[in-house]
Amino acid sequence: MESFAGSCEIVEEKDAVRLAKHSSRYCMSPLGSSKDMEQRPALKSGYQGSMEYDIDQLFQSITIKPSPRRVMGSSFHHLETSASAGTSRSTSPSNKGAMKKPFPMGTPRSPRVGPSDSISLKQALRDLCISKASEMASQKRLSKSAAASPRVSEADRIKTLYRQVLNESAGKPGLPVDKGKSLVEISLTPVVDIPSSSQSVPQRYDVLETEPSNFISEPSQAEILLHVLGNGSGIKTVGYGMLETVSLCKSNKSGSCLSSGSGDYEIEIDENHTSPPHMVIEDQLVEIDKHVTSLPSCSGSKVDTEELDKSIVSSARVKSEPTALSSGLKGKLDNFPGSGTEKSKLVSKVTRNIPRPKPRPKKKILLKKKLKIVVNSATKMVEEVDTSLEPSASQLLCQKCHCAVKSTSTENHPPSNTSHTTDKNVSIEADQESLASPRLIRIVKCNKEASKGSSDSCEVSDSGEAVIVMKQEVSPSNYSGKGDADEQIRANPTSSEKFDFSLSSKNSLGDYSSSTSMSEESNLSRFSCGNKPHMSMDVRWEAVKHVKLQYGSLGLRHFNLLKKLGCGDIGTVYLAELVGTNCLFAIKVMDNEFLARRKKTPRAQAERAILKMLDHPFLPTLYAQFTSDNLSCLVMEYCPGGDLHVLRQKQLSRCFSEPATRFYVAEILLALEYLHMLGVIYRDLKPENILVREDGHIMLTDFDLSLRCAVNPTLLRSTSPPEKDPARMSGPYSTSNCIQPLCIEPSCRVPCFSPRLLSTQARNQKPRKPKRPDLLTQQFRSLPQLVAEPTEARSNSFVGTHEYLAPEIIKGEGHGAAVDWWTFGVLLYELLYGKTPFKGYDNEETLSNVVYQNLKFPDSPLVSFQAKELIRRLLVKDPESRLGSEKGAAEIKRHPFFEGLNWALIRCAIPPELPDIYDNGATEATSPEGNNRYLECKAIGDHLEFELF
């Protein structure tokens, strides 16, 4: 077969056997063991007048017990390469029988590692014949080849590959003894002469093994596992009835690949195919015709995927004969190494020529490659990725968008300005269906690289277990009302930008200008893009962004004001429709001059700052804010269900049932917990400020009286055991004198004075012992608890509604976050009983009752003891003894009143009732006959009024 430059061939030689008989030196391959030798089938002589006949005559003098087993299927060929070439193998007695030492499938091992036994004559003769015949045949072939010189460099690469494999495989375990039966092991000895000009790293081939299988009952399968260790390559073939050989040669020239130690590659090629059913097994003879080509090395130039697909050429042919298994196993392979000064290529062949079966369909090759990327410094993200098996060394494809991943090496890009804390190893696993379509699957750990630009790229998110995410990079420039940069900022609602707010102010409402130092439009756009995950896919977001993109900015002229929803202390709320859409919004309009005269501008600024930082399902969403004609407008979410005060008035008894009350106050409790974690004390909790969404869930609104303060999260360890938890000690029958006939809680036990009506079977049964608390539950309750409660906040402001004011606010002693738990108790009382607990004839009497009057519960309606106990512990006049003052909402959620409530899935709970969706008058206001009647806003006295015109 003709050779060509840049490739390595394995061809058949017809005269190899005849040339080997002139050999005069004998050596032995130290493979296998004498114990396994006895279990192999005897080799029968077959070639009279040839070198094989002489060898078989010598073999007959050696007693070999034939194996009674009759093996079906193809034999297991073990092909091993040695680092020594041109010299005979050691015939030390310590290596006796090493040729038949079984090796594990997929685990290479050095042939020199094995038990110390004596060498047999048969092994010495076999090694002699193979080495001398290979040497002479190689010399003859090279003398006839005129184009031998172009193949020198390729042969050197293969030879150096062998040496590295042998060096690295010395410490690997071997094959179990029972797997070593019926093995035919063939040794290849390449030349060891390496020219000084060669720059390739020592490389090796792994062991080629073929294990016999049940060839009749099971389909033939071939699995090829290529190990590329370091910068070398190797071959390991594991097959059942079929063999597939792929040779991978890599050049390690300077600049073509990464530096040494860049990573390990493991490529698995799985092929499933079925042999034709008409094939009849005659003998376990396999002929392998291997066409070995070298893959192009990793270089700066791009390599076409078609060339890479053509670079791996593999073929396997399995021959079979009628079942004459008693003859045993026979296979030969000759290797022809050159002399010490000559350069030759590896030649592997089998001497039998058997008719070939029908060609099989082309098999699908699956490659699995493992790469390693090392972060070498704090200014570099990763080093170059060695992608010699991919279409291009500097380009990868993303799995989702199939876009190119830009190279992160320092040669093509300047160092990033983002500093990284530590240097980490980055491991990338790529699963490829073919060489032409590499796909990135997972990046285990990496540091985040903040790069500038507006192009789409694949970056890595900064997390403990990072994954590849598609991210559209946005320009850091502020929103200017026009340009592509603004469009990109608005079009990316899940941006990874982070925003910090100063929470250092404790008692001032106007000290938040530092958090809004940027323009209000820009600051809002950043929040609307990055901090609205639960509302990012809302249609109203898309409508607002579309109007901003179309007109450059958003103003009051883009809304149709439909009707007035309510009037507050600093502004009026209107129902509005965005022009050209069917989206309804609630717009809070505030007159800046009016606020300045009343000195309420800090309250408006505080509310705007709080709304920007909120992102909670039970808190309002701020879609936009703008100033138009001296009017400050806040575009918020519209709740068609009205407020909780109106909804309570619609009930038959003017109050909610206990399950409905538990539903509403649980969501309010979560909203207050979120606000306290942000350092916001609400201070104005009442039913009028609790709106009902269209899905029946609540939304807390109106933050103009809220106080922003510092919050220090702390870990508190539980000091009392779970069975003595103060939040759970309260119960109708927690004491021995348990008489509470009005308790209607189903979970309560029967009162002591009630008659016991038990059946006969129940009387005979032994009383069950109370279940001990679960160990896991005890451990969970004993774990440290995170508390983010602004316990140190203090304010002397007299704010709030009279009926909901806490005693400490009325006394002027200063108040903190505990005022929210007082108002929470008043709200719970009002929802259950339909009125507040301390209401008087006028405001003065109301304030007096709050400070001096004791808490009383009316006789009707009937309320459970748990609800009363919770109200009693919340309405403690001493703020330090009030429930929630120490641990906040976490302490209240553990109360028996909320027992059985799934706090994590409360959004999935069915609300008590859904609001009535009524016509808001949008059709009349926007009809052509009405000429798009708008509402005019103007300040009259102390109120804001909108008039039709």
Curated annotation (Swiss-Prot):
Residues 79-116, 323-344, 407-426, 495-525 are annotated as: Disordered. InterPro entries: Kinase-like_dom_sf, Prot_kinase_dom, Ser/Thr_kinase_AS. Keywords: ATP-binding, Kinase, Nucleotide-binding, Serine/threonine-protein kinase, Transferase. It holds the Pfam family Pkinase. It is an enzyme of class 2 (transferase). Residues 81-94, 513-525 have a biased composition (Low complexity). The active site is at residue 684. SMART domains: S_TKc (SM00220). The keyword Kinase applies. It catalyses: L-seryl-[protein] + ATP = O-phospho-L-seryl-[protein] + ADP + H(+); L-threonyl-[protein] + ATP = O-phospho-L-threonyl-[protein] + ADP + H(+). Disulfide bonds: none annotated. Residues 407-420, 495-512 have a biased composition (Polar residues). It comes from the Eukaryota. SUPFAM superfamilies: Protein kinase-like (PK-like). GO terms for molecular function: ATP binding; kinase activity; protein kinase binding; protein serine kinase activity; protein serine/threonine kinase activity. ATP binds at residues 565-573, 588. The keyword Transferase applies. Residues 559-898 form the Protein kinase domain. CDD domains: STKc_phototropin_like. Its EC number is 2.7.11.1. Serine/threonine-protein kinase that could be involved in the negative regulation of root growth. Belongs to the protein kinase superfamily. Ser/Thr protein kinase family. Interacts with KCBP, PERK8, PERK9, PERK10 and PERK13. This is Serine/threonine-protein kinase KIPK2. It comes from Arabidopsis thaliana.
